[in-house]
Amino acid sequence: MTDNTVKALGRAYGIMAAQLPNIVGTPCRVQMANQWPLRGLGDGMRYMISNRKLTPEVDRAIRDALDGVDDMDEDMQALPIVQQGMWELAYMQGRCAKILSDGEYLRERLKAKGLTMEQAAEACEVSKAAVHSWCAGIKPIPQVRRELLAERLGILI
């Protein structure tokens, strides 16, 4: 397993542990996930779903954490100690990560891609004020506009 994969799995598990600290975040489960990250990710997702904590915002945060993972193979041996340390650091980053609302996420993705609200408004065929109200959290983003954002700008909400 590559180092980037280990870090992504650690961050994703940290996000889940922040949502369910008494179940996913217990020391024995964290230690198990540290040694066998794929098993930990699967168990964490199972607990998130069964406890109804997998909201769209949390799902998006986990999806973004796992974005760019190229290989996910796990053998019967635990991770080497160096990769366990990498996993632990990424776990703490995920544990402290803020779960963004739809508007905050849109604002962050526009900033990351170097796009302005005018460009987003043009892509969605709405006014700049409408995009501003989405980013400010005043109004929810309609499903049709979410699809346009995904299609034209590559922003999945």
What kind of feature is each model-predicted range?
Residues L110, A121, A150:
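The alpha-helix within a helix-turn-helix
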Residues A136-I138:
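Residue-level detection of the helix-turn-helix DNA-binding "recognition helix"
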Residues G114-S133:
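Short alpha-helical DNA-recognition segment
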Residues M1-A97:
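Intrinsic-disorder/low-complexity detector
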Residues G40, S101-Y105, V126:
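Alpha-helix N-cap/N′ positions at the starts of helices
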Residues Q143-I157:
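DNA major-groove recognition helix of helix-turn-helix/homeodomain DNA-binding modules
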Residues M92-K113:
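A short, Lys/Arg-rich alpha-helix, primarily the initiator
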